Amino acid sequence: MSSFITKTVLAALVAAAGVRAHGHVESITVGGTEYEGLNPGAAAFENPRKELAAWFATNTDNGFVEPSAFGDADIICHRGAENAVKSAKVKAGEKITIKWDTWPESHKGPVIDYLASCGSAGCAKVDKTSLKFFKIAEAGMTSGGKFASDDLIAAGNTWEVTVPTSIKAGNYVLRHEIIALHAAGQENGAQNYPQCFNLEVESDGTAEPAGVAGTSLYTASEKGIVFDLYNNPTSYPIPGPKMNIAGGSSGAAPSTPATPTTGSGSDTPSNTAAPVESAPAESAAPVESAPAAGNGNQNNGGASPVETEAPATPQPTKTGCKAKKARRHARDMMN
């Protein structure tokens, strides 16, 4: 009985904390250039809207997409998502630093990154339901029961993902996502926070990985979506399709990155490359012992970044939880 009370109280507390603390990606930095992210609360009142490389979304509460909506378009790039009109320029093999404005410690879970080719339509006009996403990096449990989200918080709410070196040049949508597991002990308890950016990739590579429609990335009942965070887990099965491209990696960003310049993004040109759809598959990740920062339990086809130090520099000048209320009833987290 005491175990039941403990689990239900914990679930209620973290749900209440989540109402206040949900976050969004405030910027990405590529090759020393910083691109502004979408602030959904502010963007709802902008007229005209800012022209960004970040996709527009209507999650003004910084809220989430729940598993019951995995078959809906909202899971692709968040609720009510609309195409970004600009693109961030990146070279294959280059790191993208992703900066969240905040992330609650209670919302533990994996960090997963995908790409999808925009094809001949170009990313500013592509139908989001036609995008086929392939996983380029994933991180689940790290050491000592910690999750990738803990590493992200420890790195100042930042994350790094490397664009695969073998990928074909073209225009892509980057889908960066944290899945919060604090209420995932039962079906429909996980919380998905997808964030999308347009990329213009320069590359000599030729790889065109098969992909999966955003509405087919996950199922509500699969392992890793249903997961008991409070039962002292020692491993975590990362959900979603398996990776089928090498040369990508991800991990917590260095504690003192170089000072970026500010970019508005380029107009998104057309691209003729389009991946072929494949069925999703579960990806599990074993526990590793004492990894370096951001290097835990990853299946990413490449080495993860190593923490480095750099001289202190001035901060860059940038250009630029009621909603979907968190469940206030306590979930029965018992198996």
From Swiss-Prot:
CDD domains, A to Z: LPMO_AA9 (cd21175)
Co-factor binding comment: Binds 1 copper ion per subunit.
Residues that hold Cu(2+) according to the record: 22, 107, 193
GO MF, one annotated term: metal ion binding
Record keyword S-adenosyl-L-methionine present: no
UniProt cross-references to Pfam families, sorted A to Z: AA9 (PF03443)
Any one cellular-component term (Gene Ontology): extracellular region
Residues that hold O2 according to the record: 182, 191
EC number in record: 1.14.99.56
Reaction(s) catalysed by this chain's protein: [(1->4)-beta-D-glucosyl]n+m + reduced acceptor + O2 = 4-dehydro-beta-D-glucosyl-[(1->4)-beta-D-glucosyl]n-1 + [(1->4)-beta-D-glucosyl]m + acceptor + H2O
Comp. bias regions, Low complexity: 251-303
Signal peptide: 1-21
Disordered: region residues: 241-335
Location, primary (coarse class): secreted
Cofactor: Cu(2+)
Function per UniProt: Lytic polysaccharide monooxygenase (LPMO) that depolymerizes crystalline and amorphous polysaccharides via the oxidation of scissile alpha- or beta-(1-4)-glycosidic bonds, yielding C1 or C4 oxidation products. Catalysis by LPMOs requires the reduction of the active-site copper from Cu(II) to Cu(I) by a reducing agent and H(2)O(2) or O(2) as a cosubstrate. Is capable of cleaving cellulose, but not chitin. Is also active on tamarind xyloglucan and longer xyloglucan oligosaccharides.
Protein name: AA9 family lytic polysaccharide monooxygenase A
Organism: Gibberella zeae (strain ATCC MYA-4620 / CBS 123657 / FGSC 9075 / NRRL 31084 / PH-1)
Lineage: Eukaryota, Fungi, Dikarya, Ascomycota, Pezizomycotina
